[in-house]
Curated annotation (Swiss-Prot):
Membrane topology annotation: Lipid-anchor; Peripheral membrane protein
Family: Belongs to the group II decarboxylase family.
Source organism of this protein record: Mus musculus
Region named Disordered: 1-24
Its job: Catalyzes the production of GABA.
Alphabetized InterPro entries for the sequence: PyrdxlP-dep_de-COase, PyrdxlP-dep_Trfase, PyrdxlP-dep_Trfase_major, Pyridoxal-P_BS
Biological processes, Gene Ontology terms: carboxylic acid metabolic process
Positions of post-translational Phosphoserine modification: S3, S6, S10, S13
Record-given protein name: Glutamate decarboxylase 2
Amino acid sequence: MASPGSGFWSFGSEDGSADPENPGTARAWCQVAQKFTGGIGNKLCALLYGDSGKPAEGGGSVTSRAATGKVACTCDQKPCNCPKGDVNYAFLHATDLLPACDGERPTLAFLQDVMNILLQYVVKSFDRSTKVIDFHYPNELLQEYNWELADQPQNLEEILTHCQTTLKYAIKTGHPRYFNQLSTGLDMVGLAADWLTSTANTNMFTYEIAPVFVLLEYVTLKKMREIIGWPGGSGDGIFSPGGAISNMYAMLIARYKMFPEVKEKGMAAVPRLIAFTSEHSHFSLKKGAAALGIGTDSVILIKCDERGKMIPSDLERRILEVKQKGFVPFLVSATAGTTVYGAFDPLLAVADICKKYKIWMHVDAAWGGGLLMSRKHKWKLSGVERANSVTWNPHKMMGVPLQCSALLVREEGLMQSCNQMHASYLFQQDKHYDLSYDTGDKALQCGRHVDVFKLWLMWRAKGTTGFEAHIDKCLELAEYLYTIIKNREGYEMVFDGKPQHTNVCFWFVPPSLRTLEDNEERMSRLSKVAPVIKARMMEYGTTMVSYQPLGDKVNFFRMVISNPAATHQDIDFLIEEIERLGQDL
């Protein structure tokens, strides 16, 4: 790019100093020109800067600190003694950034502007006057923007515009009025840790390429096992891409424990294996059975009571039925915090049955595991210490940025022997350090993302007591919602009694249905209410809450709270918004 002031149409001094009120320099005139649309501003800037021969590329303009000629400071002196220069992104591409020669200055400016975009988004995420979502239908977004991938590179101005556009239409999951999923909130320390993790950009193969992260995973998993109740935090574990994969790990290890020959010889070498889980459990158990060749028909669903808890007597009955057929029960997966009702299976009773029949006991505490951090609520997981394995997702109730899921195993070394393949190019046996820290061979993946650092850094910042306060607050908000709507006109609870978790399940009954008899016609009409209200929520962008049918129950709202930014006022707003949007149905 030609230097400022070198073009035929350049104005003012070569040092680029300018008074915005008196545009007497190329930079100032270029700032004015950027107000023109249709690429005219870029073409004028090209003339002003002496780059008239370079074609101006399309795309929206980005008003940034760098576009005004101020680049990131590279010194520690105050006032700054760094040389000043202009960064016009319209003429810069990714190839101009590091490791390009002289790429430091545009790199610092570009990343600073990306950071500014992110920080603006963060601030907006907590602003209740902003929308949770700027909803557009898929065909609208596809027609409004060109998302296709091109052969030729775009300039950095367009890249910054893409960043802004992407965030404009993204869901603000940190918004205090976003209640749609189990994973909500935006923790600032966790966010900073995620940025650091991406900057380090390493893999969790071995100690030699991820020394600090491997140690932090060891320390953090040990602490989680201590909280579960395993003596001295003994055992094993790994961070996985999510609760579904953690549950599949448990199924894989349980099968290997009972029939180690399956690793080499496959399912043909073992009898038919049967797993058991509740009818309210997560669908990932069946997905895992399909992936491992066990088959979805080999996952038996156990009946639940009206609150969604597994019935132990039905579990034992089904185990005996399977054994009489000559099949082999190998896994019982109990749930601590079901996805819809937030129910906790009776873990002590399940543990007794598993011990009696020598079956691996897994606890899927992906959603409910966070309650172990609370002295007030951890009793709901009584018996989890008797499990052989536990899934625990800190990215749900504990508010750690996605993804952060752990599979904890009580028996040390079992995961390693189950999964190791001794790849000699990674796991050499003659290294000069303790090889037990080369954890990659016990994972199903080869490449593995660093998921531990955000949890570890948040734990250091909050302490266990901080997580406890977070969890206690969310459960108190759920009880507040339940207390308000249980006797409020127009609301019906899906099940009786206080929720055990932050899941509050209810129907909103509009005035037109309140006088109807409780019959099939009423249920049919009621089933259409929640979807319409949800659609209107998204159109207005004011709030979001999930709905679903379950069994013989027609569509109902499932409210979940895991965002510590939410308040009583946000709960009040949700109730008022549901009533406003559903009053005419």
